């Protein structure tokens, strides 16, 4: 640390130089995050100093968190769902596994997850001492449900399905997983960190939420397709009472018990998340999602015209191709199977898609 402070002008000159080293979102096609909606940025700035870890000091901000949980719970067909605002899918998935493990006594606990699951589940298993049992995928990169039953035993504390897989944008057959969960009395966690803010706004949404009786918990991230500021996730549970098993004593705060993983929690991103939902409403979110899906279809059409076939037809706005390289200046990612992966987020507009296709064509020339 400096002995003598830095002049403000010099400081912000330094910070500006570092910010210029960051990439601009226009040419980022690999991220599941996107620039925040203007109302999100405005709301975030209003609540910069708030701390949801001590809600008695910030009752208005705490009320916004409650409202966010109600709005997302209603979207997931359970208005009185339990829940709280997390830092994102990783925290939500860890907390879901914590609940599942505490709700079922198992000598050697294990969890059953699809091969497409996010790496946060590996972290969760390491932290909680859980054996991870992996379900293979079918030809469409969805969970092979016929293999699930044989992996579940009396030590299985949780089963996971994914809505909007990170690599291929697929939705696992959650309806079937719900049936299995009920039949085998297993906690079913749905990782909808990405797809949770996509599928409900599609023309023909597939069931994946609390409308299915076997679904126990859902993770959803407003800082992805919800266009909130980072970090903004949410864990929802069928029963609010389940969170009590995570409670610890907090005698020196304005609340005496706390179930969250983080202690200090930002209220600003919660305000940002609810601001977007309230400002856009269902109609506005449908329009955003429809635009992203249409741009994804156009990208697939254009890439196939150039000779790069899709790896699979996605359920949400993630496109993958048999292609080894991207044009200079564009950032895409590669799946574990070697497919080019592009996420058609709100910042990936039609103009961006068309320019990428032009550049892809020039690369082949």
UniProtKB/Swiss-Prot annotation:
Keywords assigned: Decarboxylase, Lyase, Pyridoxal phosphate
Protein's GO biological process: carboxylic acid metabolic process; coenzyme A biosynthetic process; methanofuran biosynthetic process
Involved pathway(s): Cofactor biosynthesis; methanofuran biosynthesis; Cofactor biosynthesis; coenzyme A biosynthesis
PTM-bearing positions, type N6-(pyridoxal phosphate)lysine: 224
Enzyme Commission number(s) of this protein: 4.1.1.11, 4.1.1.25
InterPro entries attached to this UniProt entry: GrpII_AminoAcid_Decarb (IPR050477), MfnA (IPR020931), PyrdxlP-dep_de-COase (IPR002129), PyrdxlP-dep_Trfase (IPR015424), PyrdxlP-dep_Trfase_major (IPR015421), PyrdxlP-dep_Trfase_small (IPR015422), Pyridoxal-P_BS (IPR021115)
GO molecular function, one term: tyrosine decarboxylase activity
Catalytic activity entry: L-tyrosine + H(+) = tyramine + CO2; L-aspartate + H(+) = beta-alanine + CO2
Transmembrane segments: none
Domain of life assignment: Archaea
Pfam families named in the record: Pyridoxal_deC
Major enzyme class: lyase
Cofactor (UniProt): pyridoxal 5'-phosphate
Matching HAMAP family: MfnA_decarbox
Family statement drawn from the similarity comment of this UniProt entry: Belongs to the group II decarboxylase family. MfnA subfamily.
Role according to the record: Catalyzes the decarboxylation of L-tyrosine to produce tyramine for methanofuran biosynthesis. Can also catalyze the decarboxylation of L-aspartate to produce beta-alanine for coenzyme A (CoA) biosynthesis.
Name assigned to this protein: Probable L-tyrosine/L-aspartate decarboxylase
Species assigned in the record: Methanoculleus marisnigri (strain ATCC 35101 / DSM 1498 / JR1)
